[in-house]
Amino acid sequence: MGQKIHPTGFRLAVSRNWASRWYADNRDFAGMLAEDIKVREYLKTKLKNAAVSRILIERPAKNARITIYSARPGVVIGKKGEDIESLKKELAVRLGVPVAVNIEEVRKPEIDAKLIADSITQQLEKRIMFRRAMKRAMQNAMRLGAQGIKIMSSGRLNGIEIARCEWYREGRVPLHTLRADIDYGTSEAKTTYGVIGVKVWVYKGDTLGRNDLPAVETPRPDEERRPRGPRRDGRPGGDRSGAGRGPRRPAAGNSAPADGSDKPAGAGGADNTAVKRVRKVAAPAAPAADVKGE
């Protein structure tokens, strides 16, 4: 049974980049990675209502720089920047180094996989039907320029006793194409009857390199077909529709016989009378006459 590899990890260093960009020695790597995980969990809880798409953590020399991509940057900044200042102080205490926080706005949250998954889970927690939430998200994504989207929900859907998985897809989502810009996001809905997981794949086109380059829209196969041009040898051959042609001449050996039989008629006017060959067999010799008298 084929399994789906993580689209972001599959495309690292090809069309995607790492979410944590720093280098460390072997003895410091585990501690710094644990700090990154704790910082992401803290920001996920702190900025739950800010529609955070992703968090980029960079560590220059004895400093830290955190970039938060949010669809609602005003919620992160707060009134007169009060919230972001308190956020900087808290992150500096957790990391132990001075922290610079940058806020980047997500222009189209409808085609961001993480924000789509979070939106669906919020609707599921409000007891909205999962099919309605999934199809509405797919329609919005395709309307705003996505070339394909796939959404999968797993768990006790609608509160049934046996968990199952349902997915819907619109457009095309090429998971094996490395140059395809596939945005992938997951989220969990904590309902009264259990946890429901949501996965979202969004295909935005083909990229020329890293994800900071613009996506290239790939034409469909039916759009690539072009009308035929003139022949190289000068003979007319561009229009093959058959307009202006006369009636076709019957082939020499394919005309039906006049007698209505199913055998093809022979070419030319030769006599087609069948000749039956008979093999001559020698007659048996007569018995010798009896010369004795009576």
From Swiss-Prot:
Gene Ontology BP, a term: translation
Output compositional bias ranges, type Low complexity.
Answer: 249-258, 281-294
Q: Where is this region: Disordered?
A: 210-294
Matches recorded under CDD domains: KH-II_30S_S3 (cd02412)
Composition bias (Basic and acidic residues) maps to 219-238
Q: Single GO molecular-function term?
A: mRNA binding
Q: Give the record's keywords alphabetically.
A: Ribonucleoprotein, Ribosomal protein, RNA-binding, rRNA-binding
**One GO cellular component from the entry?**
cytosolic small ribosomal subunit
Write down the Pfam families for this protein, in alphabetical order: KH_2, Ribosomal_S3_C
Domain named KH type-2: which ranges?
Answer: 39-107
Q: Report whether Lipoprotein shows up as a keyword of the record.
A: no
Highest taxon above the source species: Bacteria
> Which N-terminal stretch is annotated as signal sequence?
none
Role summary: Binds the lower part of the 30S subunit head. Binds mRNA in the 70S ribosome, positioning it for translation.
Protein family (similarity comment): Belongs to the universal ribosomal protein uS3 family.
Subunit structure and binding partners: Part of the 30S ribosomal subunit. Forms a tight complex with proteins S10 and S14.
Q: What is this protein called?
A: Small ribosomal subunit protein uS3
- Native source organism of the sequence: Verminephrobacter eiseniae (strain EF01-2)
* Gene designation: rpsC
